[in-house]
Amino acid sequence: MSLKLACVVVLCMVVGAPLAQGAVTSGQVTNSLAPCINYLRGSGAGAVPPGCCTGIKSLNSAAQTTPVRQAACRCIKSAAAGITGINFGLASGLPGKCGVNIPYKISPSTDCNSVK
C-alpha cells in the first residue's frame, strides 16, 4: 500500500486530482496512479508505462476546480511525508511525457494554496 501512496503523492501534485467535493475518491486516485510507481522509483531509463499516462490524463481531466486541486495537493503531501525512494526529478517530467500541461512545479515543497 505504501508504494501506491507514493504514486498518489507525486502524481496528485502533478495533476491536482480532485479528492474533495466527492469528485474522485482517494482509492480511485491510488488505483489510477499505481502504474507509475516503479517508474518513479527507478532511474527513468525506460519509457513511462502507458497505464501511468492513462491515469495522469484521467485525473487531470477530472480536476475541475481550484479548491479540489488544492485539497488533493494537501492530502498527497501529507501522505508523502512517510514515503522514500521517489525521484521527484522524474515526477516533474511526467506531465510533459504524458502530454499533460500543468501550471506549477512538481515538488514536495509545492505550496498547495498556490495551486490553481
Curated annotation (Swiss-Prot):
A molecular function GO annotation: lipid binding
PROSITE patterns: PLANT_LTP (PS00597)
InterPro entries, A to Z: Bifun_inhib/LTP/seed_sf (IPR036312), Bifunc_inhib/LTP/seed_store (IPR016140), Plant_nsLTP (IPR000528)
Cystine pairs: 36-52, 53-98, 73-112
Keywords attached to this entry: Disulfide bond, Lipid-binding, Signal, Transport
Signal peptide: 1-22
Record function comment: Plant non-specific lipid-transfer proteins transfer phospholipids as well as galactolipids across membranes. May play a role in wax or cutin deposition in the cell walls of expanding epidermal cells and certain secretory tissues.
Protein name from the UniProt record: Non-specific lipid-transfer protein
